[in-house]
């Protein structure tokens, strides 16, 4: 008899960083019309891993589809994994953050129905209306912390 296991989801969060006038900057997009955290600044190019696709391939695909930039999967560098149990629907997610250093093209809004704009923000001066993903995972990515857990919209303290 085969035992069924719960279903989990995987999402990728490309992290695009650059040096700006005020130090390191991160590229964020303003969510709209998605039904999830609309009106919040979120990691630009984030999305789900599709069937028969690796996480690196998904990050490269999402960058192409949502930002119009070309990224080779070999240039996608692992930064952080967050095991997240969503407070809203109880879904379990494995959120993978990847550093994107090398890409071709200029980040552009490719899905204006879901993305109200792109903007580079100094990591030391993020807007107040950031997504829970940015709030939870960006500090880990910047500090070199490879793993975290998030349960019902709160970080798990060990």
Model-derived features with residue positions:
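Short loop segments at secondary-structure junctions
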Residues: 18-22, 32, 101-106, 123-125
């Amino acid at each position: 008899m085969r035992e069924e296991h719960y279903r989990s989801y995987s999402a990728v969060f490309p992290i695009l960083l650059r040096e700006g006038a005020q130090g390191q900057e991160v590229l964020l997009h303003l969510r709209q019309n998605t039904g999830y955290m609309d009106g919040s600044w979120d990691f630009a190019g984030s999305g789900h891993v599709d069937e028969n696709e690796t996480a690196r391939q998904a990050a490269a695909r999402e960058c192409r589809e949502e930002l119009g930039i070309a990224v080779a999967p070999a240039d996608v560098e692992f930064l952080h994994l967050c095991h997240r149990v969503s407070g809203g629907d109880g879904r379990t997610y494995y959120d993978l953050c990847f550093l994107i250093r090398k890409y071709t093209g200029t980040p552009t809004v490719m899905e204006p129905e879901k993305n109200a704009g792109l903007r580079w923000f100094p990591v030391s001066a993020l807007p107040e209306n950031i997504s829970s993903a940015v709030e939870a995972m960006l500090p880990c990515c910047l500090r070199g912390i490879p793993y975290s857990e998030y349960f019902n919209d709160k970080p798990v303290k060990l």
